[in-house]
Amino acid sequence: MKQKSWNINLEEMMQAGVHFGHQARKWNPKMASYIFTERKGIHILNLTQTARFLSEACDLLANASSKGKQVLIVGTKYQAADLVASASIKARCHYINQKWLGGMLTNWSTIEKRLQRFKDLENKEKTGVLNQLPKKEAATLKRQLVQLRKYLGGIKYMTSLPDIVIIIDQQKEITAINECITLGIPTICLVDTDCDPDLTDIPIPANDDARASIRWILNKLTLAISEGRYNSIKTE
């Protein structure tokens, strides 16, 4: 698919503040080729580069989802958490938006057991079994359920390792990125001017702090996922 099909509009990106980087003194020199200029001590990203890599990411996601591949979106910073949840639910993706638990991918067998525990407790809650238990035991199990729902609710239906992982903030989610590298799982990552683009398969140069920027990029990525899935259903 060509870039045009994703309706990537430079003016819209500017309105969303996608082009604003960090203070120039905090930059990572590896981001030099993605930076357009510096204004008042702030680096400005080259949106032509952003459009190019975003288009590439959308192509990959559309193709993957048309083949039934699973996508995980990770964004636990407060600016991104609710945006990640809503975009993921809309596109029927898995997501982590509270805290990355170490080993979430590299120790998947343990996470699988926790997910089973989560489902068992949810079932007991729905069927009223929890309320039939002694108060102390019921309270303990309900606390467990609250914690499991908070941290694992977004991957409740993930039955295997994801095929592609989308990362919202490279520095915040470095543990997740390292786990993906270890397992050879392809990553798509928003990279601000203080990031290392070499750590991800498809770096998307973008403001990873502003909600409007995160929302705009997420909308494009999840639209590609939904479109890929829709095209798959259409051709069946």
Curated annotation (Swiss-Prot):
The keyword Repressor does not apply. Disulfide bonds: none annotated. Pfam families: Ribosomal_S2. GO terms for cellular component: chloroplast; mitochondrial small ribosomal subunit. One of its GO terms (molecular function) is structural constituent of ribosome. GO terms for biological process: translation. Its main location: plastid. InterPro entries: Ribosomal_uS2, Ribosomal_uS2_bac/mit/plastid, Ribosomal_uS2_CS, Ribosomal_uS2_flav_dom_sf. It is found in: Plastid, Chloroplast. Keywords: Chloroplast, Plastid, Ribonucleoprotein, Ribosomal protein. Belongs to the universal ribosomal protein uS2 family. NCBIfam families: rpsB_bact. This is Small ribosomal subunit protein uS2c. It comes from Physcomitrium patens. The lineage of its organism: Eukaryota, Viridiplantae, Streptophyta, Embryophyta, Bryophyta.
